[in-house]
Amino acid sequence: MAIVETVIDGINYFLSLSVTQQISILLGVPFVYNLVWQYLYSLRKDRAPLVFYWIPWFGSAASYGQQPYEFFESCRQKYGDVFSFMLLGKIMTVYLGPKGHEFVFNAKLSDVSAEDAYKHLTTPVFGKGVIYDCPNSRLMEQKKFAKFALTTDSFKRYVPKIREEILNYFVTDESFKLKEKTHGVANVMKTQPEITIFTASRSLFGDEMRRIFDRSFAQLYSDLDKGFTPINFVFPNLPLPHYWRRDAAQKKISATYMKEIKSRRERGDIDPNRDLIDSLLIHSTYKDGVKMTDQEIANLLIGILMGGQHTSASTSAWFLLHLGEKPHLQDVIYQEVVELLKEKGGDLNDLTYEDLQKLPSVNNTIKETLRMHMPLHSIFRKVTNPLRIPETNYIVPKGHYVLVSPGYAHTSERYFDNPEDFDPTRWDTAAAKANSVSFNSSDEVDYGFGKVSKGVSSPYLPFGGGRHRCIGEQFAYVQLGTILTTFVYNLRWTIDGYKVPDPDYSSMVVLPTEPAEIIWEKRETCMF
């Protein structure tokens, strides 16, 4: 009774206060509680140091969201490579550098979960039953199904299709119109997402599907892409216009794929050597005998194209801007391409998949772009069992998150000389080559979708690592290499003020801030 009376007396006292005093208490109590909680948390020796923050729940979201790499470096200087911060109600434990890559990417499946970290974000975009909306074992098999369309023989067929799409874009898009113009200005944040989706749909989904992928269809993918924002990560569904457009785009794209799948099945028109759709229609039965439904295949197609879209659109936009800042690098690539074609006695139309492997300046430019501008600045896993951090007394409790940032290591002077300088030639050195993970590493593991390098302690991991390593790395190099050689063979360009735009971290994928334009002119070898 004494406790009840005390509570009643407290309520009566609160009600007797003025409105101003009541509001002050209501606003002040959460802040006081937050400060006390942080102090008590800091006393625990089994927890990574927590970055101090003033605003409850919101935490360090502003400083992290605006400049994540600067935020990481500032925290590292104060706490070391391991620390935690509050992000919109979630405690993120960060482990920077190659040891952090090893800790997160090679963590046991029983200890961390990418599915629990991303499912609420990706399922409204991709659809149900695929990627993170299924057990990890299913995802590993889905990746294996997709890899049947990502073979060397497939890449050989893709190169001329990708080049043809780019050349057609040069003729038809208002940014270029190369049959009518000799010079002009192009916004790479318009051109590169479109070129990427047109080339990917043509090569991966076939000629019939490409005819459906007009600019209005590309806009649907743009609406889907807007579902990958920080607000979507926190609030998967809100009654807001961009959520409605995301959902409408998902339904329309999925229905389009379903129609094509149904048509091919009814016609019996399925060729295992044609494209990704046919490959999935043939290879889509799990080890336990369960078959993917056509709806799940359609959803997986969305996920695959979206994954590649992010990497290639952002990477090609960035390398066009950097090469515009340093046109002499374009000339190095141009001479390399021209000399190779001269030996063959042909022009750009004769450039093959095998030729792309003989162009070190092209591949080094892509590699350097991915170093400076990794599409995802942070990668999360949700902790499902208490997780001890090696060589420390820290334990990450169940329900918290671990965060790794290869992009931080890519741009840190601890691992790369002059990291802020765009220098493709750095990859010619033996030390730099040793930093990159080889496709043919002898230390390999098979998570269910084919062997990948087990080693993830490299400071350079643009395609991630472990069981969630991107399976599209080689396709990305084929697509990006063809885009780069086609641009350089036909055009020479600069950027205004010879200054590359700053990165925009407001979305989940790091893109250039607007305006992001190149000023182009035709080369003498231009094909129009």
Curated annotation (Swiss-Prot):
It comes from the Eukaryota. Induction: Induced after prolonged growth with antifungal drugs such as clotrimazole, miconazole, fluconazole, itraconazole, ketoconazole, terbinafine and fenpropimorph. Changing residue 450 to E: In strain: fluconazole-resistant isolates. Keywords: Endoplasmic reticulum, Heme, Iron, Lipid biosynthesis, Lipid metabolism, Membrane, Metal-binding, Monooxygenase, Oxidoreductase, Steroid biosynthesis, Steroid metabolism, Sterol biosynthesis, Sterol metabolism, Transmembrane, Transmembrane helix. GO terms for molecular function: heme binding; iron ion binding; oxidoreductase activity; sterol 14-demethylase activity. It is a single-pass membrane protein. Heme binds at residue 470. Changing residue 129 to A: In strain: azole-resistant isolates. GO terms for biological process: cell growth mode switching, budding to filamentous; endosome organization; ergosterol biosynthetic process; membrane raft polarization. It catalyses: a 14alpha-methyl steroid + 3 reduced [NADPH--hemoprotein reductase] + 3 O2 = a Delta(14) steroid + formate + 3 oxidized [NADPH--hemoprotein reductase] + 4 H2O + 4 H(+); a 14alpha-methyl steroid + reduced [NADPH--hemoprotein reductase] + O2 = a 14alpha-hydroxymethyl steroid + oxidized [NADPH--hemoprotein reductase] + H2O + H(+); a 14alpha-hydroxymethyl steroid + reduced [NADPH--hemoprotein reductase] + O2 = a 14alpha-formyl steroid + oxidized [NADPH--hemoprotein reductase] + 2 H2O + H(+); a 14alpha-formyl steroid + reduced [NADPH--hemoprotein reductase] + O2 = a Delta(14) steroid + formate + oxidized [NADPH--hemoprotein reductase] + H2O + 2 H(+). It is found in: Endoplasmic reticulum membrane. It is an enzyme of class 1 (oxidoreductase). Its cofactor is heme. This is Lanosterol 14-alpha demethylase. It comes from Candida albicans (strain SC5314 / ATCC MYA-2876) (Yeast). The gene is ERG11.
